[in-house]
Amino acid sequence: IPYELALGWRYTRAGRATRRNGFISFISGVSMLGIALGVAALIIVLSVMNGFQKEVRDRMLSVVSHIEIFAPGGAAMPDVQRTLQEARQHPQVVGAAPFVSAQALLARGEDMKGALVRGIDPVREPEVTDLVAGSQGEALAQLVPGEFRVVLGGELARMLGVRRGDVVTLIAPTGQVTPAGVVPRIKQMLVAGTFDSGHYEYDSTLVLLHHEDAQRIFRLEGPTGIRLKLRNLHEARSVALDLAGSLSGDLRIRDWTQQNRTWFAAVQLEKRMMFIILTLIV
């Protein structure tokens, strides 16, 4: 029997001999119970926080790609097809899709909200996102070039009071230059449906439309970037470094941890503080 176990067993059963030994046995039992409860609390709290982090991360990655490749300044990428081919050559890359990213205002009557506009390719989007499941996938399938249809985040649709079949006004900051100044470009868009990712930041701001329609509205010659999906999301940092050295052209690369750096840093800090506090209790 190990020495530690033999010693602990001796003191926990010491109450059979004398009253003094019984007191020692009581103190030993209380100490062991306190340590057991402290360790249990430490394990439970860290497990809950790890589960919370994983759940939020999974919901976030249903909208955010593992890696984004984009041109600086929000400009169109010089050679999208070439970059797609080069990115797919990496063994960790299992999906790639072009996108357009821009900011705009979305209006319905007197209500107006700021929005993050993302132009997507509905055919390739299933390679990099989980938004194509169920009715959300049916809505994305209606994003046909030239039809100027949009799919709104569920919370954004509720704030504007719109639903499928309604018309909203998209106001782009890029417009025509006139003697009176720059006139914003205004386009009427048909709501094809909504999506709910479970992440408020995206559900309240994100607008999806076909990337060719987005290029016309924002006067771009092509997509502004490419989104990638990896076999192992935890390899995103190393894959991004590999691609930075192999891709042609002046491009920027960021992985999913960099896109949400503030949130993940806050969660990690909270986990460390809880671990320290519970360790002191134990």
Where do the language-model regions lie?
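Feature of multi-pass inner-membrane transport and sensor proteins
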Residues: 1-25, 250
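Membrane-interface junctions
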Residues: 14, 18, 29-32, 89, ...
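A structural signal for hydrophobic secondary-structure junctions
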Residues: 81, 85-221
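Structural motif
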Residues: 50, 67, 91-97, 160, ...
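Mechanotransmission and gating elements of multispan inner-membrane complexes involved in transport
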Residues: 174-175, 182-274
